[in-house]
């Protein structure tokens, strides 16, 4: 009976370790992982770039990232790599995308949004987009001059 209990305890610890490790496929989290488990952490991250945002996301999506990000997500993957975000480590994983309205994009009154992709409680990707007449997609850094 003790052996069975010990085996069950070991199995439980291994299962918990697997669940807590998330979907990093054996890769360690980056040294500068950005916490984003709460609304406050996500908002603080965007405000840290100089963005003024609406307090609540306008959209929250739960999605499954493709196993292969090099095809249709290639440009987005490059953008995230240039920002030092671990998007590529999360291929095939589940993530949430939080979309916020940006209120202070230079030269554009409305229609600009920030997206944050979050997995395992950290930011794995982010971008700023406008789909209006002046459509664009860029990294999270506040532009030095008007968009």
Model-flagged regions — what are they?
Residues 48-109:
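Mature extracytoplasmic domains of secretory-pathway proteins
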Residues 18-33:
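Sec-dependent signal peptide cleavage junction
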Residues 111-147:
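A short, surface-exposed interaction/processing loop segment used at functional sites
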Residues 1, 109-112:
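Short, small/polar residue-rich loop motifs at catalytic or cofactor-binding pockets
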Residues 29-34, 102-105, 113-114, 128-130:
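Second-shell loop/turn segments in exported
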Residues 5-21:
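Hydrophobic membrane-insertion alpha-helices, especially the h-region
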Residues 38, 42-45:
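Stable alpha-helical elements in mature extracytoplasmic
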């Amino acid at each position: 009976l003790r052996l069975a209990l010990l085996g069950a305890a070991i199995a439980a610890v291994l299962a918990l370790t697997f669940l807590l490790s998330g979907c990093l496929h054996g890769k360690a989290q980056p040294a500068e992982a950005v916490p984003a488990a709460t609304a406050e952490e996500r908002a603080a991250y965007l405000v840290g770039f100089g963005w003024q945002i609406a307090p609540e996301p306008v959209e929250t999506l739960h999605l499954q990232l493709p196993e292969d990000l090099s095809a249709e997500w290639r440009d987005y993957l490059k953008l995230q790599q240039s920002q030092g975000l671990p998007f590529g480590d999360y291929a095939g994983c589940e993530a949430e995308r939080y979309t916020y309205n940006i209120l202070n994009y230079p030269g554009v009154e409305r229609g600009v949004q920030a997206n944050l992709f979050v997995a395992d409680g950290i930011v794995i990707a982010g971008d700023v987009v406008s789909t209006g007449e002046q459509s664009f997609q860029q990294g999270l850094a506040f532009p030095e001059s008007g968009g």
